[in-house]
UniProtKB/Swiss-Prot annotation:
Induction remark: By wounding; in leaves.
Chain spans, region Disordered: 1-33, 106-159, 178-200
Comp. bias regions, Basic and acidic residues: 8-33, 111-140, 146-158
Highest taxon of source: Eukaryota
Keyword Cytoplasm: yes
Sequence repeats, residue ranges: 3-8, 37-45, 80-88, 117-125, 145-153
One cellular-component annotation, GO: cytoplasm
Gene Ontology terms for molecular function: hormone activity
Propeptide part(s) removed at maturation, as residue ranges: 1-178, 197-200
Name this polypeptide is given: Systemin
Main location: cytoplasm
Native source organism of the sequence: Solanum lycopersicum
């Protein structure tokens, strides 16, 4: 009687083993799901490749910008020539003045063109990009009054430029002298007033 009872228990163990095998299959299904999860990030890696391609497109856009900037400098040179030609038309009142003034303005045109050509490559080497656009525009508006005319004034009107610098230096010296002279008397006067008050 006892032996069949053990056989029944053994059969029970076999029945327990079968669901264990089924559980293993279910776990195998979970592993397949994990593999699918691993495949999804691989698609994200492909998306990263597309992002890198966009970066390359950005680089290609920057190169034509350099070309457009250089074209802008050439256009500015042409505008400077046109403005000078307008001044010549205004001065063309006297026949004698035409010949003399034309020779002077032609020399100025050639000098200004050379100065602009020397400045633009130096800026392109240092900045190469968007900074080169911003600085020359500011120099053409305000910088011309400081840099290019200063060179022209030294060649054409050197005396006027020297007089301006002399006046600035004289003003600075006068301010320093007044400041030095005003300090010692201010220190000496108050003690005299105090002694007078004490005597009274």
């Amino acid at each position: 009687m006892g032996t069949p009872s053990y056989d029944i228990k053994n059969k029970g163990d076999d029945m327990q083993e079968e669901p264990k095998v089924k559980l293993h299959h279910e776990k195998g299904g979970d592993e397949k799901e994990k593999i699918i999860e691993k495949e999804t990030p691989s698609q994200d890696i492909n998306n990263k490749d597309t992002i890198s391609s966009y970066v390359l497109r950005d680089d290609t856009q920057e190169i034509p910008k350099m070309e457009h900037e250089e074209g802008g400098y050439v256009k500015e040179k042409i505008v400077e020539k046109e403005t000078i030609s307008q001044y010549i038309i205004k001065i063309e009142g006297d026949d004698d003045a035409q010949e003399k003034l034309k020779v002077e303005y032609e020399e100025e045109e050639y000098e200004k063109e050379k100065i602009v050509e020397k400045e633009t490559p130096s800026q392109d080497i240092n900045n190469k990009g968007d900074d080169a656009q911003e600085k020359p525009k500011v120099e053409h508006e305000e910088g011309d009054d400081k840099e290019t005319p200063s060179q022209d004034i030294i060649k054409m009107e050197g005396e006027g430029a020297l007089e301006i610098t002399k006046v600035v230096c004289e003003k600075i010296i006068v301010r320093e002298d007044l400041a030095v002279q005003s300090k010692p008397p201010s220190k000496r006067d108050p003690p005299k007033m105090q002694t007078d008050n004490n005597k009274l």
